């Protein structure tokens, strides 16, 4: 469950290390985002020669949450951290590599590129 002011790690090679959620997209009263949801983030920590710099605002998709996601068979998939992948205005990933596992819930028409770049799909 990601809400405004939540800090997330970045799971791609854009150069951003951590981001902060500034808005959960999808309705004016929407409070929480989970895996597969799009959020608006600002870069809080960035590598010196990365593609993004501190203070930039981007869209991002949540790929891992500590809260986890419940599957129809009753199993629960949790992670140690909250992580996101930065997106451009066309909702395509900015980075060319994804670090760490992602969940099968991202296998929609929108995020197949992220699933194909990920080293492991749970």
Curated annotation (Swiss-Prot):
Gene name of the encoded protein: rplN
Family, as annotated: Belongs to the universal ribosomal protein uL14 family.
Physiological role: Binds to 23S rRNA. Forms part of two intersubunit bridges in the 70S ribosome.
Protein name: Large ribosomal subunit protein uL14
Family annotation (SMART domains): Ribosomal_L14 (SM01374)
Lineage: Bacteria, Pseudomonadati, Pseudomonadota, Betaproteobacteria, Rhodocyclales
PROSITE patterns: RIBOSOMAL_L14
Organism: Azoarcus sp. (strain BH72)
HAMAP family: Ribosomal_uL14
GO cellular component: cytosolic large ribosomal subunit
GO biological process, any: translation
């Amino acid at each position: 469950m990601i809400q405004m002011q939540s800090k997330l790690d970045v799971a791609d090679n854009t150069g951003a290390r951590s981001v902060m959620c500034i808005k959960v997209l999808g309705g004016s009263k929407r409070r929480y985002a989970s895996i597969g949801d799009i959020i608006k983030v600002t870069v809080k920590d960035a590598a010196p020669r990365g593609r993004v710099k501190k203070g930039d605002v981007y869209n991002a998709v949540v790929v891992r949450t500590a809260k986890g996601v419940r599957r129809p068979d009753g199993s629960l998939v949790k992670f140690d951290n909250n992580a996101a992948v930065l997106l451009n205005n066309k909702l395509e990933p900015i980075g060319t590599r994804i670090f760490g596992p992602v969940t099968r819930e991202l296998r929609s028409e929108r995020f197949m590129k992220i699933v194909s770049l990920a080293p492991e799909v749970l």
